[in-house]
Amino acid sequence: MTGSVRKRGDKWYYSFEAAKVDGKRKRIERVGGRTKKETETALRKALEEYSQNGEYFEIKDISVVDYFNYWFDNYVLLNCKYYTQRNYKFSLNKYILPEFKNYKLKHLTPQLLQEFVNKKYLQGMTKNYLKSILTPMVSALKYAVYPCKFIKDNPMNYIKFPKYNQSESNRTIITIQDFKKITDKYPFGSYPYIPLVIGYYTGCRISEVIGLSWDDVNFTNNTISINKILLKKENKIYIGPPKTKSSIRTIKIGQTLLNILKKHKSYQNENKLKYGSHYMNQYSKKDLIISSKENLSLPKISFICTKENGTLLTPNQIHRIGRIINDKLNIPFNFHSLRHTHATLLIENGANIKDVQHRLGHSNVQITLNTYTHVTPKMSEETVQIFENLPTT
C-alpha cells in the first residue's frame, strides 16, 4: 500500500487509499506536518497502523471536560446503577475535572496522571479513597480507547500506586464488648437497634438491611432473603436491585436474631395501634416508595427497619448514628464495620469459607478472603498452637 504527499496553501497533507466500502473507493487525507519530510514520516506511520489494524487511528481533539461529560451521558447513565452514577459524579466534580479541566483528552499522559496520584498520596489521601476516585478515570479512558477510538491507549494502565503502610488497609473489627456498648446506648425500642443487630448477625450491607421487609423473613425455616435494596435519589426513596447477581441470596439466621425480629414485629404492631391514623405506611409505585398516613390504592410494603411512627429509615440516618458511636463511645465505627466483623468472626471460629462467601453475597471466594477476613489475636494464637501440637519425633 502506498500513499502520497502534497502541499496545499501553507500546509502539507498526506493521503492513501483505504479499503473499499460497499464497493466504493475511499481515500483518507490528513494534515501531515510543517514540512514535506515530517509529512512523509506521518504517512509511513499511518500506513503501518492501517496495515496492522485495518483502520486508520486518529486522536480526537476534544477537551477533558467535554469528553468526561460525553462518557457520563453515553455510558454511565445507561449502564451503571444509581449509587455508581452518584459516586462517579462526585469524583468527577470534586477531583478529576478541577484538576484536568484545562487539558485536552490527548494530553492526559501517564506522567501527568502519575503526578496527580503522587500529589494526592502526599496530601494524606488513603489508598482505598484514592482508588475510588481513580475508578471513573480508568473506566472513562478505557471507553475513550474503545469503542470511541478517541485515544490509542489508556494512560491509566501505567499508573503505579505509592507504597502505603500495610496497616493503612486494616479494617475495623467491632469486639463483642464494644457491640454491647453500642446496643446499651441504642437498646431495643430505639430505631438504630434493629438495623445494627441485623448488620451484626447477618453481615448485610446497609442498603440491604434497610431494604428488608417482613415477607423476606421466613420464621419457619429461619431464613432471610436479600432481594432488594433501598436507595435515596433526589430526596426520594427507591427500591433497587442488590449490588450484583450474587448479592441476591437467602441466608440462615440463628435463634438470637430470630427472637429479636419476632419481638420487633410485635413492637411494630403495637405502634400501629398506638399511632392509629398517624402511623406512616409505605407503598410502592413501580420502584418509587411513597410514605403516607393515608390508605392508598397501591401495593403496601411492610419494612422491618422503621421508626416508632412507621417512618422509613434511610442510609444517611444510619451513617449519623455511626458518627455518634465514634464521637460519644469512642469506638471506631461505620456500618460496614459490622460486615467485616461478621465475616471475621465466622472465619475465626471455623466457618467454611464458601458458606461465608454465599452469606456475604460475593461473586467469588477471593473477594471474601482478601477483603473481609482479618488476622486477629485468636487466629494468631491458634496458628501457633497448630505447630505446638505437632509431634516432634
For each predicted feature, which ranges?
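DNA/chromatin major-groove-contacting recognition/catalytic segments
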Residues: 116, 181-185, 235-240, 349, ...
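A short, basic/aromatic helix-end/turn motif that makes direct DNA contacts
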Residues: 211-217, 357-363, 373
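Short, basic (Lys/Arg/His-rich) helix/loop patches that form interaction surfaces
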Residues: 123, 184-189, 202, 251, ...
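N-terminal DNA-binding module of tyrosine recombinases/phage integrases
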Residues: 8-13, 18-111, 268-300
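C-terminal secondary-structure termini that scaffold catalytic or DNA-interacting sites
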Residues: 221, 234, 240-248, 252-257, ...
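Catalytic-site neighborhood detector that most strongly recognizes the C-terminal catalytic loop/helix
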Residues: 165-166, 173, 230, 341, ...
